[in-house]
């Protein structure tokens, strides 16, 4: 019997409107490994175009990984101290008040998480197109939104994306046990796929040579320098995105004061190793010129770098990589669906979102919140605008990340007597460095993409009238399912 099933059986005396602590350490690590998505297969090319040498690309991967690890060490203390559904929403609410917590939750629910689901589901559909034709496009439109031109289209790929979102929404609304099983299976499959590509590149590649790492090439698109290295770091940080989601299911992790920190730290160390070794394999298998000209904004019709590397040891390598792409994307999709829906659930329980979303199903999962998130993501997936809109929230994502990091310092002073079974390693230096670098990334985004950053702030600010409404009509949903008077 799985740990999830066992926990569910052991909790019949608990109130049916209380979450079940059913996620084991293994399940929690699998959720952290949701981070391993399609980015590791794609990002080497744009990073190479920015910094112009293999060593700098690898260094950027390592630096981004260490930054993410510093963040994980910081989040670990917060997650262990406040193991509740909602994660970052809870941390920001406790440190800075309802408004800041709400604006994070609003952004997560309405754009960041749902946009991520739309993006990943369309990625799965595009990878599926390598095996099945999904070329039909029936409607195309252009919209002008927040100073940007948004291209809208409806076709076979969008419908498949919607079907995929509905499938994984239904799986996770069915129960925590099923969602956790799917996550573990996807994690094992995608790690196995990466191992196949890495071993094939190192042991069987017809073009493999360590000399590929010794030939720096001048970047063709962006000048090198500190700014360029920062841009490369930002590119790789998207591949690390998602490690912070585990605390969102803090209310369902067994022994959270131990397992949340351990899962975050062990999981991130594993991700750093996987990303570094995988990119090292790409540079070993391919001349740097091939990496430079792989699929990216500059070379839209080229093969992804992972496909090129696989092609050096097997003629059907690109098809193999497409399959692994799809598995990795499915794992990310399931993980986002499972974890992020706990944010609107927590907000609704606090009376700061639609109250029905704060009610659990008879299987003790926030099924209504899961379906709300999924259906909203379907609308974004149908529109096809997710990739352009989410570009506008890079600034906001890092703004909230910096705020969460700083909340550790605030809560150390605000709640000095709170139980802390785990304290952030390297405090205050490591959390401070994390906050400083996150703030630098906020400023970097602001100066590099001012229009998109401003648009991101506008999208967040749209939540303000909703906050006023929810505050005016606020009635909290208690853990026993009763609505406060």
Protein language model regions, located:
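Hydrophobic transmembrane alpha-helices that form the core helical bundles
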Residues: 46-49, 69-165, 170, 326-346, ...
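Hydrophobic alpha-helical segments and their helix-loop junctions in multi-pass secondary transporters
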Residues: 126-135, 188-217, 237, 280-288, ...
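A generic transmembrane alpha-helix motif of multi-pass inner-membrane proteins
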Residues: 55, 391-392, 396-397, 426-485
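C-terminal membrane-solvent junction of multi-pass transporters and transport-like membrane proteins
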Residues: 153-154, 356-367, 401-452, 477
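Membrane-interface loop-to-helix entry segments
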Residues: 156-210, 241, 264-268, 393-403, ...
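TM-loop-TM module centered on a large, flexible mid-protein loop between adjacent transmembrane helices
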Residues: 90-91, 97, 129-144, 216-220, ...
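Hydrophobic, membrane-embedded alpha-helices of multi-pass small-molecule transporters
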Residues: 23-41, 160-168, 201-204, 218-274, ...
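Membrane-interface "cap" regions at the ends of multi-pass membrane proteins
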Residues: 1-54, 68-73, 82-85, 417, ...
């Amino acid at each position: 019997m799985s740990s999830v099933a066992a926990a569910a059986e052991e909790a019949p005396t608990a109130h049916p409107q209380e979450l079940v602590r059913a996620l084991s350490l293994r399940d929690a690590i699998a959720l952290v490994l949701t981070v391993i998505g399609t980015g590791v297969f794609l990002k080497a090319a744009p990073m190479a175009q920015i910094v112009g040498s293999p060593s700098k690309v690898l260094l950027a991967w390592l630096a981004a990984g260490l930054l993410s690890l510093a963040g994980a060490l910081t989040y670990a203390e917060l997650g262990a101290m406040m193991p509740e559904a909602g994660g970052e929403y809870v941390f920001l609410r406790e440190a800075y008040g309802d408004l800041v917590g709400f604006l994070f939750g609003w952004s997560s629910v309405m754009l960041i998480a749902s946009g991520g689901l739309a993006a990943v589901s369309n990625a799965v559909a595009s990878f599926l197109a390598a095996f099945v034709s999904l070329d039909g496009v029936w409607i195309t439109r252009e919209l002008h939104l927040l100073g940007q031109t948004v291209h809208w289209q409806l076709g076979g790929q969008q419908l498949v994306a919607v079907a995929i979102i509905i499938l994984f929404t239904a799986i996770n609304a069915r129960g925590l046990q099923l969602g956790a099983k799917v996550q573990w299976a996807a994690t094992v499959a995608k790690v196995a796929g990466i191992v196949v590509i890495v071993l094939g590149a190192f042991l069987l590649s017809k073009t493999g040579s360590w000399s590929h790492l010794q030939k720096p090439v001048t970047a063709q698109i962006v000048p090198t320098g500190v700014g360029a290295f920062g841009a490369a770091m930002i590119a790789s940080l998207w591949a690390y995105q998602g490690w912070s989601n585990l605390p969102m299911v803090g209310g369902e992790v067994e022994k959270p004061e131990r397992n949340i920190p351990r899962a975050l730290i062990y999981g991130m160390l594993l991700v750093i190793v996987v990303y570094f070794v995988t990119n090292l394999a790409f540079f070993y298998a391919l001349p740097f010129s091939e990496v430079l000209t792989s699929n990216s904004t500059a070379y839209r019709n080229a093969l992804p770098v992972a496909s090129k590397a696989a092609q050096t040891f097997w003629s059907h390598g690109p098809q193999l990589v497409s399959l692994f792409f799809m598995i990795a994307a499915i794992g990310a999709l399931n993980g986002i669906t499972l974890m992020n829906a706990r944010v609107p659930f927590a907000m609704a329980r606090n009376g700061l979102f639609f109250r029905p979303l704060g009610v659990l199903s008879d299987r003790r999962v926030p099924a209504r919140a899961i379906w709300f998130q999924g259906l909203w993501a379907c609308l974004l997936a149908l529109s096809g605008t997710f990739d352009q809109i989410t570009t506008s929230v890079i600034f906001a994502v890092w703004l909230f990340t910096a705020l969460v990091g700083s909340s550790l310092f605030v809560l150390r002073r605000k709640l000095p007597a709170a139980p802390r079974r785990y304290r952030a390693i390297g405090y205050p230096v490591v959390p401070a460095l994390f906050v400083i670098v996150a703030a630098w990334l906020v400023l970097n985004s602001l100066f590099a993409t001012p229009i998109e950053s401003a648009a991101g702030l506008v999208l967040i600010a749209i939540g303000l009238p909703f906050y006023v409404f929810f505050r005016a009509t606020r009635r909290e949903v208690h853990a026993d399912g009763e609505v406060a008077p």
